[in-house]
Amino acid sequence: MKMIKKLIIAMSLWIFCHTLYLFIDGLNDEGKKADVAIVLGTKMNNDGTLSARLQARLDQSIVLYRQQRVKKIIVSGIGHGPNLQQAKRMHEYLLSQDIPATDIYADDKGYDTERNVKYSLAIMKENNLHSAISVSQYFHQTRAKMLFRKAGFDNISSSSPRYFEWQDIIAVPREFVAFYVEWLWTW
């Protein structure tokens, strides 16, 4: 019984520390400059419009662009179900915010974070871009940066919008599990 209690305490401490790290790492913006911001896709509204979460990510990339911290923006994501034109919708939104078409690249093949990373890196290689800032929700950044590094790309930092919603209560534990699944899967 003592061993089980110690195991439960150890697991709880591990989960707490990892979750705390997700918050610290995800909300820490080092202020670095990079060649490109990579906006990782997320769920859209059922009618095919941008969700508030996705718009917050795009708005964060616009801030980086206007502060001249990035020269280009990659939007990455295919979406699911009726929202299969996620990258197209993100591209259109950036255009509507006066980001020049020549400064936007779209990956419309990445349907999960691992593939977003893969296809974004291919776009970067094709366009001679060597550094990136991942733009996603704070809880997603640790795993996203891990996947970039596992793909052999170390020149990655992150910037997250200050957008929080009640669904984060579900997303944070899901991200905890996803981090270790990806870590083990890509080992």
Question: Over which residues does each language-model region extend?
Answer:
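Enrichment for repetitive, rod-forming helical segments
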Residues: 12-13, 64, 181
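Hydrophobic membrane-insertion alpha-helices, especially the h-region
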Residues: 5-20
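A structural signal for short, hydrophobic/glycine-enriched beta-strand patches
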Residues: 19-173
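Cytosolic-side transmembrane helix boundary signature
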Residues: 1-2
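A transmembrane-helix-recognition feature enriched in membrane-embedded lipid enzymes
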Residues: 168-187
